UniProtKB/Swiss-Prot annotation:
Function summary: DNA-dependent metalloendopeptidase that mediates the proteolytic cleavage of covalent DNA-protein cross-links (DPCs) during DNA synthesis, thereby playing a key role in maintaining genomic integrity. DPCs are highly toxic DNA lesions that interfere with essential chromatin transactions, such as replication and transcription, and which are induced by reactive agents, such as UV light or formaldehyde. Associates with the DNA replication machinery and specifically removes DPCs during DNA synthesis.
Domain notes: The UBZ4-type zinc fingers mediate binding to 'Lys-48'- and 'Lys-63'-linked polyubiquitin.
Region listing for Disordered, in residue ranges: 191-219, 349-389
Record protein name field: DNA-dependent metalloprotease SPRTN
UniProt cross-references to InterPro entries, sorted A to Z: Rad18_UBZ4 (IPR006642), Spartan (IPR044245), SprT-like_domain (IPR006640), SPRTN_ZBD (IPR055220)
Subunit structure comment from the entry: Homodimer.
Residues the entry annotates as binding Zn(2+) 1: H88, H92, H107
Signal sequence residues: none
Amino acid sequence: MGDMQMSVVDPTWELLDPNPDIRALFLEFNDTFFWGQLSGVEVKWSARMTLCAGVCSYEGRGGLCSIRLSEPLLKLRPRKDLVETLLHEMIHALLFVTHNNKDHDSHGPEFCKHMERINGRTGANISVYHNFHDEVDEYRKHWWLCNGPCQKRKPYFGYVKRAMNRAPSSLDPWWADHQRTCGGSFVKVKEPENYPQKRKRKNDPTISEVNSSSHVKGKSNGVDIRTVIPFSGTGYKLFEPNKSDAPLKILNINPTKDKAAVPLLNHTPPSTNINGTFLTNKIGSAKSTPAQSILTKVSVANTKVFINLNGSPIKLPSGSKNKSHQISSKQKSVLPFFKMQKDNSFDLTLPSPSIQSTSQKPQKDISFGFTLPSQSFPSTSPGSNSENKEPLYKKLQMNDRESFIIHSGNKTNVNDNKSCTGPAATTASGLNHTIKVSCPVCGTEVLECKINDHLDTCTSSGPQKDILLDVSLPLQSFPSTSQGSNSAIKEPLYKKLQINDKDSFIIHSGNKTNVNDNKSCTRPAATTASGFNHTIKVCCPVCGTDVLQDKINDHLDTCLQNCNT
């Protein structure tokens, strides 16, 4: 048969592929007989079409062309009839998509030309009309008989047979002619077995409700999901104020019972802060106030009470709840230390030396809390009391990409009680007229009260987003951490720290080494080849523990790993 080894209508296909995939057949026939021009045509089964074996519909130029095959008729016929019906409809589709549909009756010369071409190549018997009359009559279960003269006329003898329960009416195109020539009325004489019972069962709301509930298993209408899927864990109930810090444990909630039943409260687990120390629950204590008994929601958004640790809310210690400057991921956390000017200048108000953290491991969203002696930092807010000796807690958040360490280079003796109790002369803004501070831009010593004007002059070239601060610190008070460095070098150590208006800073302070003491500044007591002192202890910025200076790097690595876990 040409280029094919076996005819598409060969009887062997009945055993090899009795139920073929019509989409696979369509693609194969499109490439073999129709030059691949039907790739945009749709082919599918139709479960309701019982009058004809196939239909090809076209929505016009550029529209959808669809082929539908009758599943009720073709499933009772041999495979050969399915193939011939599909080829028949594909010829119609070819005439549609190539705009060659000149045949007004759809089966004219153009159709017959392609039909004969395919029949000659395949040995098929594609015809104009099908002969599945027995199958069509099998699905016509609803019969009506006319009581007029037309019941004696050929070919129908007054019968109207249909597959659906639709009585003859004026909607039929032949109704007007029947009324004029016969004038009789139609009476239903036959319908499928048990059809009234099926119709009654379908229209009965009680039966349909029972059937719907029996068929759809596990589906609940208006029922709490917690009754279908029991929840035995702990959690917080949304949109309801919690009366305790403890998580709510929901047990056996039945929505049909009294609504006054509330979820049982599980025992309160001990909360921990970021340093790993346990915090006590003060609800119900003798010192609790009505405001404390009704707490806000447990959320990382409430930065006054909780901090964000890897997405989990951790309660802050009670001593830092009332502080106005709490943990923040933006630069608002360092505003108490630096007062931003309009031209990106800073008012540096930290006179104490600091110890540089040597750990360079990037940590994400880790908050450090450390205590700074308030005596060494005069308050910069208007109206604040300089005699306040309460420790100042500052919580600064360190980000892996936006973390900087600022070393203060002011040589004020932090152990001098006279200079710690209060400034010699302060203005209403809290600035001292006698203390000189070092300009972070040019390094010149300027009076503290005039540092802002001096910074404006230094940066008068124009607003800059990135400003480099040169902070000169004596090398002897801050031993170098690099291997093989010489501790006897007297040259000042300059650190370039870039300050961005969107970055956050970590300021390490609290080193009580007297920078004015020449003995301590000339040479450390005992140093190793790496520059660390074996006798000086430094405070860990993470947990606050005093650790030997040469052990601080290992201790910081351990603390940071514990924070992550």
